[in-house]
Amino acid sequence: MSSSVPPSSVPSSSVPPSSCDCFVSLPPASLASVVLFGKNSDRPRDEVQEIVFRPAGSHPPGSKLKCTYIEVEQVAETLAVLLSRPAWLWGAEMGANEKGVCIGNEAVWTKEPVTEGEALLGMDLVRLALERAPSAQQAVQVITDLLGRYGQGGSCREDPEPLIYHNTFLLCDCSEAYVLETAGPYWAAERIVEGARNLSNQLSISVCPWREHPQLRSHALQQGWWDGQGDFNFSAVYSLEKQPVRMEAAKLRYGAGQELLRMQAGHITVKSMLNILRDKKSGICMDSGGFRTTASMVSVLPRSPDVPCIHLLTATPDPSRSVYKPFIFGPHVTQVPWVLSPSFGEHDPTQQIPRFQTQVDRRHDLYRQHQGALEACKANKQEAEETLRKKQLKLEDENLHWVDTILDPSDSADPVGGSDMFLICVEKELELYKGIGEKQCTHTEV
């Protein structure tokens, strides 16, 4: 039987801060007729995030699927998915599928205690929903069904000292978005059909959820968290009464994110979303207490069926010093090897019991080259760092021009690359960093 950890002790001040920020913009908040999704994945600062592509698949009846810790029943058909994930686990921090569904998850602590027993991680639920759901609404159903059947639990970091939390999710497709917030097996969901919304590691659904767990209110009554009088406010009822320091910081980021969206309402573009995710003053682009933004993602989901969805990913830490690279699903897409971490098979510390007793080097090629270029420049002078950043932004501008060409149906130019777009962009970035290393970051004109 899994043991419960009292909510008052999770999270404790001895555990590093864990934070993420998710954003979605729908018309009329978006300038164009698109839905925009964005997420910063804030994780232990040395954790490597890889970009994984998995094609659609067919599976025989009775198949089992091994997730990070447990097995679940496999479905007959799975969709092609693009995942940005911590390299040690099965699931994903954020991702998209071939139908234009995007999902990101966040850590949350509530009055409902977390459990030490291994179950599905929130990141497993992200991937399972992407593989199984052709719409955001169906993804909500997939997650809540799996939550009810298998539960959520297990350590969410590669360390002997466990970090355990429950999850909130932001899910969207080209027509609508959903916020799904959980407290143990209990949950509430909100539907969004216009405007902008953000999440920052706290319950945010108040009254009149779109849907909710059938025992959500009766459980709160039974626990004495709600008296049954007046409107039922999910976030007020299930949130911790005494918030840890990290949750107070989440409130500040949540408010800052709301303000950044409000200031640009009606004019939110891909560039707007990139700038929000790079905002250091608010803490949205974070580096604090052993945690930092280890990967970032922005997706453009056009409402026109004739225009493809485009997903931009960094695959490297700190979006303010990284390059967003576009990906499009297509019949000839393959895994880009330079953003895939090495495999350790049965020797992987995640597969051994007790888990996480040793460490392995999970850095992929792009991560290594990015890290090397930044360190080489830092060892020289500020001018070298500024020169590198200018070169990164120049490369990203080329990537964004490519995106604009594809999104503009009136542009007759043939978008060369298509399925190879992400691969080409990764290759260019690798060449940039190799050149920097060879020149030892000497100051040159861009």
UniProtKB/Swiss-Prot annotation:
Pfam families: Peptidase_C69. The active site is at 20. GO terms for biological process: proteolysis. One of its GO terms (molecular function) is cysteine-type exopeptidase activity. Belongs to the peptidase C69 family. Secernin subfamily. This is Secernin-2. It comes from Xenopus tropicalis.
